[in-house]
Amino acid sequence: MQHEHTEHVAAPPDAVYGAIADVTNLPRFVPQMTAVRRSDADRVEVDARYEGREQHGEVSFTADELARRIEWSAPSGYRGWMQVDQDGAGSRLTLFLETLHGAESDHDIAATLDAIRMLVESEV
């Protein structure tokens, strides 16, 4: 299942990109994540709580500062990206997500984007 959502953020693109590229921020805008640690330059370890169960996994995570884009993928087929573009005086943040099992809902994805927007706008 594929999802794509876009949200305007009233902050400069570099500020939005900085927030999403810092993996330690993930638990601040993805409520299911409880901890994130970088294991090497392109991989992160993630602790999360889904459907009442604690889960631990490692995912690839790359950040392209010039393109203001992050990408991630897990062995389970879960993958996605976020892209930040200039949008007038602010930014346009797009999130794309692909899952094999349809676990994520459009509401959850929209809530994640909204949490990022609130986080970044409160800090600029």
Task: Describe the predicted segments one by one.
Residues 9-11, 48, 97-99:
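Short beta-strand-to-loop capping motifs
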Residues 1-41:
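Hydrophobic ligand-binding cavity/cleft-lining segments
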Residues 63, 69-124:
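Beta-strand/loop substructures that line and gate deep hydrophobic ligand-binding cavities in soluble
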